[in-house]
A protein has these predicted regions:
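N-terminal export signals
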Residues: 5-21
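Short active-site neighborhood of thiol/selenol oxidoreductases, capturing the structured segment around
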Residues: 53-70
Length: 192
């Protein structure tokens, strides 16, 4: 019986177009107290270290995504536009690729989508899900200037809209975040 259950679960994950987020509660979840992040080996597309310690002192949005996750890929253009708009105001926008193919997959996806502003960041050891307690993709972590997680958004969001911008400005200003500040879920696209 356990084998059948395992095979059924494995089959559900293999269905094309299904991201993990469809199986979890979606939206903004604000922590009662900031949470420290575990250690993770993050690299840029040249294989150089690009971990969280490289941007401490600024609040950050860290989006965990994979090229096989359609909602993740559909969300990337909004994150690209958000980065261009909000980084000059003092926040970092990081798209952390969790693909097995690493930087190659991220570079190819960014090229296909004409992503201009996001930099390639890769979970080199593919442990982000475990280290950050992220069971579904896409998941976005919101970090304060001390590098502590204050909230997370589960599912694809319209980050470049007015609510996404307002949420990021509240994070930059070190104001308390509340669930009603959540940007809307991104609308699915047929060919991200």
């Amino acid at each position: 019986m356990n084998r059948r259950l395992f095979l059924a679960a494995l089959s559900a994950l293999a269905i094309p177009g299904q991201g993990w987020a469809a199986k979890a509660a979606q939206g903004l979840f604000v922590h009662a107290a900031p949470k420290p992040l575990g250690d993770l080996d993050i690299r840029d597309n040249n294989g150089q270290p690009a971990g969280f310690d490289t941007f401490r002192g600024k609040p950050a949005l860290v989006n965990l995504w994979a090229s096989w996750c359609l909602p993740c890929v559909a969300e990337l253009p909004a994150l690209d536009r958000l980065k261009a708009a909000i980084e000059p105001e003092g926040a970092r926008i990081i798209a952390l690729c969790m693909d097995r193919a690493g930087a190659t997959s991220a570079v190819n996806t960014f090229a296909r989508l004409k992503i201009k502003n996001l930099s390639v960041h890769v979970d080199h050891q593919r442990k982000a899900g475990e280290v950050f307690g992220v069971p579904v993709l896409p998941t976005t972590l919101l970090l304060n200037k001390d590098g502590l997680e204050v909230a997370r958004f589960v599912g694809p969001a319209a980050w470049d809209g007015p609510q996404g911008m307002a949420l990021m400005r509240a994070l930059i200003a070190d104001k308390p975040l509340t669930p009603d500040m959540a940007p809307p879920l991104a609308k699915p696209t047929e060919n991200p």
